[in-house]
UniProtKB/Swiss-Prot annotation:
InterPro entries recorded: Aldolase_TIM, FMN-dep_DH, IPdP_isomerase
List of residues binding substrate: 9-10, 98-100, 162
Keyword tags: Cytoplasm, Flavoprotein, FMN, Isomerase, Isoprene biosynthesis, Magnesium, Metal-binding, NADP
Any single Gene Ontology cellular-component annotation: cytoplasm
Localization annotation: Cytoplasm
PANTHER family, A to Z: ISOPENTENYL-DIPHOSPHATE DELTA-ISOMERASE (PTHR43665:SF1)
Catalysis performed (reactions): isopentenyl diphosphate = dimethylallyl diphosphate
Binding site for FMN: 67-70, 98, 127, 194, 224, 274-276, 295-296
Documented EC number(s): 5.3.3.2
Record NCBIfam families: IPP_isom_2
Single Gene Ontology BP annotation: isoprenoid biosynthetic process
Protein name: Isopentenyl-diphosphate delta-isomerase
Length: 346
């Protein structure tokens, strides 16, 4: 694919995701099926609740990840800078969007060591698509992606549905697991696998862990639907109809999280996919997540400034802190033991 086509596609994606009426799946995340048992006597000081955690040797002041969002369009440079500055100020993690354009063209879209300069202390994750592993990418490209941003780990994203409904998408996914296993064995940093909004099943998660993957982002249904995004940018009515049929496809985030945690009890898990506030983040942690990711929910703020991103996440962090307080949880370990009532099926 030409540089112009790649960049045009990334610009289309950004424009569509910025309009939630065009991209959000009607499928719920599943978190609405759960409600915390309220603790009317917490015996805690709200301001002393400890939200700290760690992953891959980096300390985080809160269990939050700015999820992979944008990596191709020229305007991504400002967005990524705003996100990095905010992540550093807040002490949370950040994953960049796909680095394919930066790896295959002369442009970097802000995906350089400057991100590390802006955020010297954060957990920073590089990213490219799994389909590229059977189209020529290997350890060298993975190293370049990580070194480009001075990252701590590499996300390899699984997006077979998006590729299947996308005009010109990658249709041959044979050999992807074997390529992931080879990459995990040879890359000197951890490999994280994530979906992009259709979820990861228990069976797939188990195969990934057996292949040497260090962590999994379940990235379930309920947030951005990339099938809906591709329907919105389809080249013709037939392609649009094909994509629209899958707009609600996927495993809801809560259901995926429960299943993968049961199948992989010792694997670090990230919950993303439609998590809108700190109460849902608290539910995700109680259900087994180590970190909670958010992407589209902060994109509008990221278009404006790092201060807007900080304000957005300060609200979410305070919501998470109050959820801990009102469940009698002094820290994240306590939150994982809180009583979560299931009111209905996910």
């Amino acid at each position: 694919m030409s540089k112009q086509s790649l960049v045009s596609r990334k610009n289309d994606h950004l424009d569509i995701v910025l309009d939630p009426t065009r991209a959000i799946a009607a499928t719920g995340t599943g978190f609405g099926a759960f409600r915390f048992e309220h603790c009317a006597l917490p015996e805690l000081h709200l301001d002393q609740i400890d939200l700290q955690t760690a992953l891959f040797g980096r300390r985080l002041r809160a269990p939050l990840l700015i999820s992979s969002m944008t990596g191709g369009a020229a305007r991504s440079a400002a967005i990524n800078a705003h996100l990095a500055e905010a992540a550093q100020q807040l002490g949370i993690a950040m994953a960049v969007g796909s680095q394919r354009v930066a790896l295959e063209t002369a442009g970097d879209q802000g995906l350089t060591g400057q991100l590390r300069q802006l955020a010297p202390d954060i957990l920073l994750l590089a990213n490219f698509g799994a389909a590229q592993l059977v189209r020529g990418y290997g350890v060298d490209e993975a190293r370049r992606a990580v070194e480009m941003i001075e990252g701590d780990a590499l996300i390899v994203h699984l997006n077979p549905l998006q590729e299947a409904v996308q005009t010109g998408g990658d249709r041959d996914w044979r050999g992807v697991l074997q390529a992931i296993e080879a990459l995990a064995a040879r890359l000197p940093v951890p490999v994280v696998i994530k979906e992009v909004g259709a979820g990861i099943s228990a069976a797939v998660a188990r195969r990934l862990v057996d292949a040497g993957v260090a962590a999994i982002d379940v990235a379930g249904a309920g947030g951005t639907s990339w099938a809906a995004v591709e329907a919105a940018r389809a080249a013709d009515a037939s392609q649009q109809a094909i994509a629209e049929a899958f707009a609600d496809w996927g495993i809801p985030t809560a259901q995926a999280l429960l299943a993968v945690r049961d199948a992989c009890p010792n694997t670090p898990l990230i919950a993303s996919g439609g998590i809108r506030d700190g109460v849902e983040a608290a539910k995700a942690i109680c259900l087994g997540a180590d970190l909670v990711g958010q992407a589209a929910g902060v994109l509008q703020a990221a278009m404006h400034s790092s201060e807007a991103v900080v304000s957005h996440f300060e609200v979410l962090i305070e919501q998470l802190r109050i959820a801990c307080f009102c469940t009698g949880s002094a820290d994240l370990a306590g939150l994982r033991q809180a009583r979560l009532l299931q009111l209905s099926a996910c």
